[in-house]
Amino acid sequence: MTTRYIFVTGGVVSSLGKGIAAASLAAILEARGLNVTIMKLDPYINVDPGTMSPTQHGEVFVTEDGAETDLDLGHYERFIRTKMNRRNNFTTGRIYEEVLRKERRGDYLGATIQVIPHITNAIKEKVLAGGEGHDVAIVEIGGTVGDIESLPFLESIRQLGVELGRDRTLFMHLTLVPFLGAAGEVKTKPTQHSVKELRSIGIAPDVLVCRGDRAIPANEKAKISLFCNVEERAVISLKDVDSIYKIPALLKAQGLDQLVTKRFGIDCKEADLAEWEKVVYQEANPVGEVTIGMVGKYIELPDAYKSVNEALKHAGLFNRVSVNIKYIDSQNVEAKGDEVLQGLDGILVPGGFGERGVEGKIMAAKFARENNLPYFGICLGMQVALIEFARHVAGLEGAHSTEFKPETPHPVVGLITEWINEDGQVEERHEESDLGGTMRLGAQLCHLEEGTKAAAAYKSTTCVERHRHRYEVNNNYKERLEKAGLIFSGLSSDRSLVEMIELPNHPWFVAGQFHPEFTSTPRDGQPLFEGFVAAAAAYQKRDLED
């Protein structure tokens, strides 16, 4: 199979939405029957984002094969059917690590190691490997043209453009075309300078996607085409929209997919975007609204919970309600108590690390349990629910996790020392293990107990979800907790680890050790999120009737 490559770069400013634009183009090409994948090349020195602060980098998206990756890979999976893996995301740090490891082994036979050719060759090898087996591979280059950090990646794709030829490569550049209120017009000069910078390093863009708060007038498109040496039909206007799921239709309406297929000489059917039209319609026409309180510690940056936010919205689509997310700092719960939890239709406690704010999350779980308020716990959200139950229902005073209180008299949650990974191999960890790349990661089979809310949600006695954690329920306390009324509704593939818990006499108190948000998409939803939002809508209805 001959793979064609589309390289996506960004200029003028960061956060233009290269990932969304790349994913939207991929969605159109997929709708034309093509097998598409997307890669993200990140210019930072970290080996992966696994140990980076969520408040700086946003969430860490976990792939099926256990790679800790950039949040853009979540966008990719939400827009196309292709599942991402560790080949879809790599960093400058990983490239340097692998090159230096080869140098230490003597693989380079004493050669002087340089950015060109050794680093650039390593980048090219990874790009080509990531595209294998696909009709089209879209490659997003992180950062902004002009950044020092991005230069090795840009040089690598320049070389690939020469080596693969024009019939297998296309360069798409996103820029900002701002509107100046004082002048009453859009300004194209930043785009001209960005393209000039890109051309100075040997890359001539074939397509310009111009971002702005409004559509670019035809005369300004012609001006951009003239000064940037790009065909006028290849100057694409991408204005701000109220839903990212409208973007595939916007790009298709301007013929971007036809431009791509013509360039690559691909003969394929027209794109049918009916599924996306349905998503946009559902999003614009809810019949109700629910308010979900998300109790976390990284709420100053909503991108820290990007996949959770999107999964709640997807669940709203399937329940025909708009989901209003109220972000609640768990430390505020500690300081102010129940008053910050009033007026909610459900509480969700997402994953997280570190002791700060943990007691507030435990208090939120207690509030939901005692008030029959729908509760959904994810990863740490399951652990705090179990700790709360152990303390206040099972009579285990002082119960805690050894992550936060090693000397706790009742360590109901402790470090996982051994488990079966996604390949069926036994992995082991201990307290002295490195933080990076040492968690239980990736897709794992979970056995669901018949008759539970979990099994009802999945309509099955098994599910496969992705994990990212070091701590688990201490099996020594399972019998005591079960006698107190807690249901262990999900167990690991070998039934040695607790994966899900729930309460029997509660409208919806369900929690999982895994991260179901990573498998939610706007077209397919996700069973647990759908069940949770349905329970929130039912709670609101009962509350109004009372």
Curated annotation (Swiss-Prot):
Q: Name one GO molecular function term.
A: glutaminase activity
Swiss-Prot/TrEMBL catalytic activity: UTP + L-glutamine + ATP + H2O = CTP + L-glutamate + ADP + phosphate + 2 H(+); L-glutamine + H2O = L-glutamate + NH4(+); UTP + NH4(+) + ATP = CTP + ADP + phosphate + 2 H(+)
User: Where is the stretch described as Amidoligase domain?
Assistant: 1-266
Active site at which residues?
A: 379 (nucleophile), 515, 517
Q: What are the record keywords, sorted?
A: ATP-binding, Glutamine amidotransferase, Ligase, Magnesium, Metal-binding, Nucleotide-binding, Pyrimidine biosynthesis
Q: Where does Mg(2+) bind?
A: 72, 140
Annotated binding of ATP, by residue: 15-20, 72, 239-241
Give the residues the record marks as binding CTP.
Answer: 14, 147-149, 187-192, 223
Q: What is its EC number?
A: 6.3.4.2
**Pfam family of the protein (one):** CTP_synth_N
The segment(s) forming the Glutamine amidotransferase type-1 domain are: 291-542
CDD domains linked: CTPS_N, GATase1_CTP_Synthase
User: How would you summarize the oligomeric state and partners of this protein?
Assistant: Homotetramer.
Please share what else the UniProt entry notes about this protein: CTPSs have evolved a hybrid strategy for distinguishing between UTP and CTP. The overlapping regions of the product feedback inhibitory and substrate sites recognize a common feature in both compounds, the triphosphate moiety. To differentiate isosteric substrate and product pyrimidine rings, an additional pocket far from the expected kinase/ligase catalytic site, specifically recognizes the cytosine and ribose portions of the product inhibitor.
Q: Kindly provide the name given to this protein in its UniProt entry.
A: CTP synthase
